[in-house]
């Protein structure tokens, strides 16, 4: 696959080295909040909505205050060239089959936003916004704000990089704030028509071009 990435009409124009990991993000849920409210881990979109609602209005942290939300997110810088509202919402968008900016299938190639099911996603998104189950600061949060918020227990469901979630810089402050708190990684919710995705897996490539100074013999040796 890496070789095909730099091959055009039978000619190899460089080296392509794939990244080690194609996808390293998952959907996290506060396990202690589920237990506190007597809820099970959600598997469908409807179940997830019920969890988001309960996390927002049923005092999952037990502090007697109305200070939690169901879902948390932030708008990444990549949203300038990716579909809005961005990657943090793709586990929800995936329930409608419209995760990612592009539909890369040969039969339906094109922008996701033009697909009929994208409207269904927007209806669900508006439902969540109107119900107040998404932390309203998602439009202003930067990445550091978003991570500070989940470490402070502001919301109980979010998409996060596994490496960031497992980083001592992140879990140590969370553990200090919530000694009995914890997360589980769950599958993305299954939508009304059976669609499910935490987000597209796009493996990055490092490309090293071959100089014009390379002789055909050297090029053949390099290309293998």
Feature names for model-found ranges:
Residues 1-224:
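Extracytoplasmic/secretory soluble proteins
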């Amino acid at each position: 696959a890496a070789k095909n990435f730099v091959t055009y009409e039978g000619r190899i124009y460089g080296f392509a080295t794939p990244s080690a990991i194609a996808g390293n993000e998952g959907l996290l849920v506060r396990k202690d909040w589920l237990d506190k409210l007597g809820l099970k881990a959600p598997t469908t979109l409807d179940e997830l909505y019920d969890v988001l609602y309960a996390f927002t209005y049923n005092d999952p942290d037990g502090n007697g205050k109305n200070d939690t939300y169901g879902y948390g997110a932030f708008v990444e810088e990549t949203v300038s060239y990716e579909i809005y509202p961005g990657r943090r919402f793709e586990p929800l968008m995936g329930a409608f089959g419209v995760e990612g900016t592009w539909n890369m299938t040969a039969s339906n190639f094109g922008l996701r936003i033009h697909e009929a099911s994208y409207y269904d996603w927007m209806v669900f998104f508006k439902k969540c916004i109107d119900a107040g189950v998404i932390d309203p600061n998602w439009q202003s949060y930067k990445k550091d704000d978003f991570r500070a918020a989940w470490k402070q227990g502001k919301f109980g469901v979010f998409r996060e990089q596994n490496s960031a979630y497992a980083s001592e810089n992140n879990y140590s402050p969370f553990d200090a704030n919530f000694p009995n708190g914890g997360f589980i990684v769950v599958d993305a919710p299954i939508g009304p028509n059976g669609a499910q995705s935490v987000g597209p897996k796009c493996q990055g490539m490092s490309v090293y071009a071959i100089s014009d100074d390379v002789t055909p013999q050297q090029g053949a040796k390099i290309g293998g």
